[in-house]
């Protein structure tokens, strides 16, 4: 745009070690706040609206030991479209420490609020609260939760700040949080019906366990590790959930499409899907809501009641929103079918959707699908994949090797190949061929397949580490 937002990182020659309560921190400690998705521009006020990301590392004790709000992380910001000067901002998550981005799509609407016509922007960021803000002044008008939240009890409309739940302070103990790291609403678009004044949101309920990094808790030191996710928390707790000291059970993972009233916080209706990772919706003037889902179905609902009116199996997982357009008086609806994104991290390892994920059941294919009333073309039915896990090699590994491999896998491999060795659109390593097993060290350590995108870890891990992670994968595959 006319003005770029830049963040200088001047730490290339700096040892990446940070000490608690130290006044000197390498600048890498203050990363975060990046933009992920589309910007919203509105000419009436000549403003550009952006949503910013979370802090990194997640643990604010490491990133900002003195505390504070950490402006402008997880914020909605209005910029002058000509100069780039900030006109106003609203921070959704002060003291951000949960990976709660505010980068989700920003929607513009006209609403009557408390008897006054207001020009507003609306957002459902990851933290679970739905924000209605005067887009000219930045005044917070509503902040109702659209999913269950336990990290904060509510948002105080007077101060604009969330009221934190003291029982969910992960600085003191391991706790499970709602929303988790995936958020209540992710990258997938939401849509709006201007007649009903209702927003349709593809929500997720995925709790995450947060705990301060063990080494930091004991020593006050945090060392950045290349090649992994440096959250400052025990990231491997995502796949090995400990017993919670408060005795609470973690709720099941679910995904829904909800019809949400942005002013009252009421959910008018909801559709529960077979899994959590589904597509963004499209609302039409014909009182329809279209949505694709992770089970491979593209469906249309009555916008007022949520009644399912039409469904078509595409045999492809869908996460994109559809679009509609007219050509020569004929209305079309098109959608890019294909799966991916952060859902790779969970695969089908959690929840009750095993065998229902289209990209696992049939494979992952990117296709542009277009529909119209009276269309005659058929979608090719895909055969189910053979998901029989092959015979595994004998590695003569000890329990110590396997446990060490579990930690290595969680920190270096799970982000692509799936937590607990349950992959999705990137290779599920339980299905490695005999040849791949034989070349495991050559691939993972030496980088034999680097041209295909699988970089070697010889600069980070040892050959013993590679044996340990291989042992863990084989152990999981033989259970």
Language-model segments: residues:
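C-terminal capping alpha-helices of c-type cytochrome domains
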Residues: 458-479
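Repeat-blade elements of multi-bladed beta-propeller folds
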Residues: 25-27, 31-61, 75, 100-125, ...
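Gly/Gly-Pro-rich "capping" loops immediately C-terminal to redox-active cysteine motifs
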Residues: 418-453, 457
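Conserved blade-ending motifs and adjacent loop-strand segments that build the rim/top face
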Residues: 95-97, 104-105, 147-151, 180, ...
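Electrostatic cytochrome c docking/interface patches
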Residues: 383-408
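Conserved small/polar residues in nucleotide/adenosyl-binding loops
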Residues: 1-4
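Short, conserved, GDST-rich strand-edge loop motifs in beta-rich repeat architectures
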Residues: 51-70, 205-250, 338-360
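The canonical Cys-X-X-Cys-His
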Residues: 405-419, 440, 444, 454, ...
């Amino acid at each position: 745009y006319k003005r770029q937002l830049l963040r200088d990182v001047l730490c290339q020659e700096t040892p990446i070690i940070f000490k608690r309560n130290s006044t000197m921190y390498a600048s890498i400690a203050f990363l975060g706040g990046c933009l992920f998705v589309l910007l919203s521009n509105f000419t009436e006020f000549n403003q550009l609206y952006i949503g910013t990301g979370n802090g990194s590392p997640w643990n604010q004790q490491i990133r900002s030991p003195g505390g504070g709000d950490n402006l402008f992380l997880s914020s909605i910001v209005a910029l002058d479209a000509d100069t780039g000067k900030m006109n106003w901002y609203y921070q959704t998550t002060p003291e951000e420490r949960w990976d709660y981005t505010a980068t989700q799509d920003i929607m513009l609407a006209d609403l009557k609020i408390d008897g006054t016509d207001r020009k507003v922007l609306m957002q459902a960021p990851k933290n679970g609260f739905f924000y209605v803000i005067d887009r000219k002044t930045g005044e917070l008008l509503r902040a109702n939760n659209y999913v269950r939240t336990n990290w904060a009890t509510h948002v105080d409309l007077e101060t604009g700040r969330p009221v934190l739940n003291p029982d969910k302070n992960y600085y003191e103990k391991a706790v499970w949080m709602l929303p988790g790291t995936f958020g209540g609403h992710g990258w997938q678009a939401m849509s709006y019906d201007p007649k009903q004044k209702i927003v349709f949101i593809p929500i997720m309920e995925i709790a995450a366990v947060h705990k301060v990094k063990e080494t930091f808790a004991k020593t006050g030191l945090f060392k950045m590790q290349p090649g992994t996710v440096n959250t400052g928390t025990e990231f491997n707790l995502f796949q090995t959930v400990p017993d919670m000291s408060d005795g609470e059970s973690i709720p099941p993972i679910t995904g829904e499409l909800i019809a949400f009233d942005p002013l009252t916080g009421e959910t008018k209706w909801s559709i529960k899907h077979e899994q959590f990772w589904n597509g963004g919706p499209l609302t039409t003037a014909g009182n329809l809501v279209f949505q694709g889902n992770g089970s491979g179905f593209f469906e249309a609902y009555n916008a007022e009641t949520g009644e399912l009116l039409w469904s078509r199996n595409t045999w492809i997982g869908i996460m994109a929103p559809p679009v509609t357009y007219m050509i020569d008086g004929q209305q079309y609806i098109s959608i890019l079918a294909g799966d991916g994104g952060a859902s790779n991290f969970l695969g089908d390892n959690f929840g009750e959707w095993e065998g229902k994920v289209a990209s696992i059941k049939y494979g992952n294919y990117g296709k542009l699908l277009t529909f119209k009333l009276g269309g005659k073309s058929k979608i090719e039915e895909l055969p189910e994949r053979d998901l029989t896990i092959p015979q595994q090699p004998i590695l003569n590994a000890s329990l110590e090797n396997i446990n060490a491999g579990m930690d290595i896998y969680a920190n270096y491999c799970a982000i692509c190949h799936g937590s607990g060795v349950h992959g999705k659109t990137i290779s599920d390593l339980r299905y490695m061929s005999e040849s791949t097993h034989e070349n495991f060290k050559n691939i993972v350590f030496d980088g034999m397949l680097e041209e295909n995108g699988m970089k070697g870890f010889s600069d980070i891990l040892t050959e013993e580490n590679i044996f340990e992670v291989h042992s863990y994968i084989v152990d999981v595959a033989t259970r």
